[in-house]
Amino acid sequence: VLACCWLAAAAADGNDERTTSDLSESLRRRGETRTYHAYVAKQQSKLALYPEKIRAIDVARQHQVRREFAAAVARGTAGVAGFGGRTVLCLGARLGGEVRAFKSLGAVAVGIDLEPGRGNMDVVFGDFHDVPFAADSFDYAYSNVLDHIYDLRRFGREVARVVKPGGLFFASLYPGASVGGADAWTAKQAASLDDRPAFVAAMRACGFEEVDETRITEDMDLSSVMPPGARNAIWHQKILTIYLRRRS
C-alpha cells in the first residue's frame, strides 16, 4: 500500500507568481504569463474540450510506454532489471494509459493528474507541483508531459521528494516550439527536446544525476479522432527519455 499524505492543492494567491530568475532563458520563454490558478484551470479544461482525442492519446501512450520500457528492461538501461513489485508514480497521467503500461510490466503503479476523469481506478487527482504522496514513496517516477510544467524548480523538488534515494525518474522529452510541438496548453516553463541541457541542469540542482537515456522515433495515428485532412492527424514523435537517479 502506498503511503499517502494529502497536501494543499493550491498555493495562496500571494504566491501565484513564482520566481524564474535562476532558470535558463530557454525555460522561461514559452507559455502565457498567467497566475498559477489560471494555469490549473487551463490544464483542467482540456479533457472536457477534447475527450475523444485525449482517450485516443491515452491508449496510444499505453502501448508506446509498454514497448519502450519492456525494451529498456531487456537492455538493462540504467540498471533497470524489471518492474516486478516496484512502485511507480506517473506524473500528469491523463486517463492512466501509462499507469496500465507499467502495471502490465509488473509494477505497483499509480498516476496523478489535474483532470483524471470520473471513476478512474488508475489515476487520482493531483498536481505534480505539489505531489499528494509522502516522501520516499516510489522506486520510480515517470512523466511524458513536461511541456505542461508551470514551475520547473518546484516540479523537480517534488519529484525528488517522493522518489526514494537511489530511485529513478524517467523524463520523456518531445520536440518543442521550434518544430511545432507547442500548443495552447504549453505551460510557462515547458521543457522539450530543445531544452535538454537546461532541463538536466535544473533536475541536477534538485538532487538528480543523469545516468542514461534512450531515443525512439514513433508515429501516433490520431486520424480517427481528427477532422478529415487535418495536418496533425499523424504525430511524428521523436522521444528522448532521460534516466535521472536521485542522489542518496
Predicted features and spans:
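Class I SAM-dependent methyltransferase Rossmann-like catalytic core
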Residues: 19-80
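Conserved class I S-adenosyl-L-methionine
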Residues: 170-202
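Core SAM-dependent methyltransferase catalytic element
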Residues: 206-208, 214-248
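A short SAM/SAH-binding and catalytic strip from SAM-dependent methyltransferases
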Residues: 139-152
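A short acidic, Gly/Pro-enriched loop at the edge of an enzyme's catalytic core
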Residues: 129-141
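A short glycine-rich, Lys/Arg-flanked "PGG" loop and its adjoining helix->strand segment in the class I
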Residues: 153-168
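Short helix-loop-beta connector
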Residues: 81-86
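Class I SAM-dependent methyltransferase SAM/SAH-binding core
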Residues: 87-130
